[in-house]
Curated annotation (Swiss-Prot):
Residue span of region G3: 81-84
Entry's transmembrane regions: none
Catalytic activity line of the entry: GTP + H2O = GDP + phosphate + H(+)
Name of the protein in its database record: Elongation factor Tu
Keyword set includes Transmembrane: no
Region (G1): 19-26
Binding residues for GTP: 19-26, 81-85, 136-139
UniProt xrefs under HAMAP family: EF_Tu_B (MF_00118_B)
UniProt: Mg(2+) binding residues: T26
Length: 400
């Protein structure tokens, strides 16, 4: 019999475990649910249950992700864990499960490894706001100075990728010992889990809700209402909009057009305000039907700008995932689906030493679109060719 759902009275936050394979991400996830279950704040989810992660689809890509939930005194957490390295890469690039904070798991026996670096780099590129380190398997290292060394290495690595490596919390423990500990919250083997949760509560900042960000709505459709003017429809991506507010139409050229949203409607009813997540129609003052089109965005003036050239981290689908069967090189020209825009672009540059990109690769490349689109760092998009998705990307740097 399933337990009733948690009552959501506490602020909610999305977190996840990241790090190198076999460093203990999944065991740590299990240990957290075990500890919280002792207070009735979670259902204990053992390792085996987390490890057989169900498949999800995001932007045409199949990803295995496990979601668990637990609470502390302060917050309600939704926690994601992925079984395979490729699943992490795909999740972070598609944004299938967003993270407001990440727990970087590093084994004391190994220190930072290649996937540790890759996950940290991606966390930086997709704007994960904060990171906490859990040094795992400390019971398997006899010399505490070795653990100190691992901690220094991890802090250096995080600083290199612009996280506050000197300041962020580093917890030491053994996830396996915690899972195997008796059901006593004061047991010494569970102390590290308590420390980790306390650090999450105090160090992870409250997420900025989408409604608190500047208004932005991708244009899905445009039509004219006789005698009233031009209406654009779409789903508000962030922020709040009220009638009478100034907005900009951005995209398709470097010129942006100012307008005033004179009316906001939902299901043919006028609204005093609409917010992130709402599907609405906005009546635009002084805009002809041919001055606005699908693929542009309506946004708070000055909050986002149009660009043609940018760097992006792209995961290229494998043949088995429905992607390309062959590699591509510089000069490849697929379609980029950026919000509602469907625009041709060219891969104008690849990293030094990379001649071709193989299906299954994850590569940072430079892209130039044929016309400017409203773009910002950390934004996700799909890469398509001949009607099928061949890749998923995230903008890592704006060039022009």
């Amino acid at each position: 019999m399933a337990k009733e759902k948690f009552v959501r009275t506490k602020p909610h936050m999305n977190v996840g475990t990241i790090g190198h394979i076999d460093h203990g991400k999944t065991t740590l996830t299990a240990a957290i649910t075990k500890y919280c279950s002792l207070f009735g704040w979670a259902d204990y989810t053992p390792y085996e249950m987390i490890d057989k992660a169900p498949e999800e689809r995001a932007r045409g890509i199949t990803i295995n992700i496990t979601h668990v939930e637990y609470q502390t005194e302060k917050r309600h957490y939704a926690h994601i864990d992925c079984p395979g390295h490729a699943d992490y890469i795909k999740n972070m690039i598609t944004g299938a499960a967003q993270m407001d904070g990440a727990i970087l798991v590093v084994a004391a026996t190994d220190g930072p490894m290649p996937q540790t670096r890759e996950h940290v780099l991606l966390a930086r590129q997709v704007n994960v706001p904060a990171m906490i380190v859990f040094i795992n398997k400390v019971d398997m290292v006899d010399d505490p100075e070795l653990v100190d060394l691992v901690e220094m290495e991890v802090r250096d690595l995080l600083s290199k990728y612009e996280f506050p490596g000197d300041e962020l919390p580093v917890i030491r423990g053994s996830a396996l010992k915690a899972v195997e500990a008796p059901n006593d919250p004061n047991h010494p083997d569970l102390k590290a889990i308590k420390e980790l949760l306390d650090a999450m509560d105090s160090y992870f900042p409250d997420p900025v809700r989408e409604v608190d960000k500047p208004f932005l709505m991708p244009v899905e459709d445009v039509f004219t209402i006789t005698g009233r003017g031009t209406v654009v429809t779409g789903r508000i991506e962030r922020g709040v909009i009220k009638p009478g507010v100034e907005a900009e139409i951005i995209g398709m050229s470097y010129e942006t057009k100012k307008t005033v949203i004179t009316s906001v409607e939902m299901f043919r009813k006028e609204l005093d305000e609409a917010m992130a997540g709402d599907n609405v129609g906005c009546l635009l003052r002084g805009v002809d039907k041919d001055e606005v089109e699908r693929g542009q965005v309506i946004a708070k003036p000055g909050s986002i700008t149009p660009h043609k050239k940018f760097k992006a981290n792209i995961y290229v689908l494998k043949k088995e995932e429905g992607g390309r069967h062959t590699p591509f090189t510089k000069g490849y020209k697929p379609q980029f689906y950026i919000r509602t825009a469907d625009v041709t672009g060219e891969i104008v540059d690849l990293p030094a030493g990379v001649e071709m990109v193989m299906p299954g690769d994850n590569v940072e490349m430079t892209i130039e679109l044929i016309y400017p689109v409203a773009i910002e760092k950390g934004m996700r998009f799909a890469v398509r060719e001949g009607g099928r998705t061949v890749g998923a990307g995230v903008v890592s740097e704006i060039i022009e």
